[in-house]
Amino acid sequence: MQLLQSSVIAATVGAALVAAVPVELKARDSCTFTSAADAKSGKTSCSTITLSNIEVPAGETLDLTGLNDGTTVIFSGETTFGYKEWEGPLISVSGTNIKVQQASGAKIDGDGSRWWDGKGGNGGKTKPKFFYAHKLDSSSITGLQIYNTPVQGFSIQSDNLNITDVTIDNSAGTAEGHNTDAFDVGSSTYINIDGATVYNQDDCLAINSGSHITFTNGYCDGGHGLSIGSVGGRSDNTVEDVTISNSKVVNSQNGVRIKTVYDATGTVSNVKFEDITLSGITKYGLIVEQDYENGSPTGTPTNGIKVSDITFDKVTGTVESDATDIYILCGSGSCTDWTWSGVSITGGKTSSKCENVSTGASC
């Protein structure tokens, strides 16, 4: 009898010990955070994160890096940021198979007027970059309504990222906003930006390096247009397999542009501009220039960066009377194998300074 009791006790104790062994806990289905600190500390504890009316403290990032695979992030209410001169970013998101979206009526407001001084990133106040989508892979950003970024909007360094129906409205910065690029893409693959609406004071799109990138159904107002580059002078100086299509560029300095860095090396290849409509362009309707140095054109092109297999198809519209319809300044032998079809840009001046234009193109 005593032996039986001992066996029962031993079995009971053993079961209790097994039950006490810690096991991996599954993330809760959903969490709602009302502060940046809580979001940072609790971001891996739930599969759906709702960010409700968060006021991000000055000099801090709304840190959503390292999310669990498959996490959904929902911006709800109004997301705002305290004022401080610093580099940023104000928001950073990373992870795999992440969905970033917003609730109905939500907005993300950078209140950039506190930093805007007409100098952008070239001096004056130090201004924070807005949204880092770095290592945000096999993921999506959908429907965000963003207002008043201090300088650049999205910095994209990711693979397989879809950005759909995002609005970036910096129209309040017409006087003092500067360098408010909407989408800067570098060292990325398979990026798809569809249905973007942009009001800003710099490039609507700037692809500095990467491959398999598409921008379609976009509306770009007030900035510097749709750009490849500037390419060159970085660790990654290759842009290839890019399609920019079915988009409008209005009230902007440039329409479509390829710019490469003076005396640098690299490659721009298989780039297509298709079905682009221009109006109210104040500087250049279509421009390719291989003379950029320290952020400005020199007028002297170099040929270290090859610009080949480029398609301009149905790029049409008007520029202002003191603007230039088309300007192509290539290095010797570096612009080759271009396809030029249905290009009709009118209203401005014809350039007399084009050089080394690819066969088939017209300047």
Curated annotation (Swiss-Prot):
Active site: 202 (proton donor), 224
Disulfide pairings: 31-46, 204-220, 330-335, 354-363
Keywords in alphabetical order: Cell wall biogenesis/degradation, Disulfide bond, Glycoprotein, Glycosidase, Hydrolase, Repeat, Secreted, Signal, Zymogen
Chain positions of PbH1 repeats: 158-187, 188-209, 210-230, 239-260, 268-290, 302-347
Gene3D superfamilies attached to this UniProt entry: Single-stranded right-handed beta-helix, Pectin lyase-like (2.160.20.10)
Main location: secreted
Propeptide: 21-28
GO molecular function, one term: galacturan 1,4-alpha-galacturonidase activity
Locations listed in the record: Secreted
Protein's GO biological process: cell wall organization; pectin catabolic process
Cellular component per GO, a single term: extracellular region
Function recorded in the entry: Involved in maceration and soft-rotting of plant tissue. Hydrolyzes the 1,4-alpha glycosidic bonds of de-esterified pectate in the smooth region of the plant cell wall.
Protein name in the entry: Endopolygalacturonase B
Organism: Aspergillus oryzae (strain ATCC 42149 / RIB 40)
Underlying gene: pgaB
